[in-house]
Each structure stands twice: as C-alpha cells, then as structure tokens.
C-alpha cells in the first residue's frame, strides 16, 4: 500500500491502510496500527511487518499502570474509572524477576514499593 506513514523506523511498513509504528517506547519491536490512540500494549515478541494488532483499547482514557509497561511478566493493565479510585492489584514487574503482588491504592497513582522477596517462577 502506498500512503504516508508515521515514524522513521517503520516508515516503509503499512498494514490494513494504516501505518505501523512502535507502540511502546520500552519495546521498539512492538508495533501497532497508528490509528490506535488509547491502548494498552502487551509485552510480546517482535512481529515482522506488524501483521497483527498487539494492543487492546481502553474503555476509558484514564488508566492505571503501576508497572509502567516494563518488560517482564506484566499483565495488561486494566482501565480504572474516570475518577481512578478503584484499587488495582497486579504484579510489580521487572526485567527478570517477579515481586510479590502490590496493591495500588486510591487514587491509583503510585504503587506501594515492591516487596524485597521475589520469586523466580513466572507470574
């Protein structure tokens, strides 16, 4: 397909009439259609030519992301209510280890510090 594409790394790639570009700053291999505006990027393996979407839309624009989409065993974040007062519990993820789950207290701003006791098994 021909047409203007966004981004320098994937400027020559297009799929489904849309452009492909990195969806996460921390994971340049992760591509998504540029039309995805409010999305949650999953930590996935590199997909050649962005042949399939690897993001999911948020139901609300305000989302809580305690792990900041760090690489590792992070699960896709869930969208909080617009007030962001719901308590979200999910693993605090790092590169190679999984810490004990931490609670994100209202107003879903920052997670409590990650537990020093980490497990080596997958989350």
UniProtKB/Swiss-Prot annotation:
Question: Mind telling me which InterPro entries this protein's record contains?
Answer: KAP, KRTAP_type_2-like
**Origin, by domain of life?**
Eukaryota
GO cellular component terms, semicolon-separated = cytosol; keratin filament
- Swiss-Prot/TrEMBL keywords: Keratin, Repeat
From the UniProt entry, list the residue stretches annotated as the region 11 X 5 AA repeats of C-C-[CDPQRWG]-[APRS]-[CIPSTVD]: 5-112
Q: Which family does it belong to?
A: Belongs to the KRTAP type 2 family.
The task this protein performs is described as:
In the hair cortex, hair keratin intermediate filaments are embedded in an interfilamentous matrix, consisting of hair keratin-associated proteins (KRTAP), which are essential for the formation of a rigid and resistant hair shaft through their extensive disulfide bond cross-linking with abundant cysteine residues of hair keratins. The matrix proteins include the high-sulfur and high-glycine-tyrosine keratins.
Record's subunit section: Interacts with hair keratins.
Task: Specify the protein name.
Answer: Keratin-associated protein 2-2
Q: Which organism is it from?
A: Homo sapiens
The primary gene name is KRTAP2-2
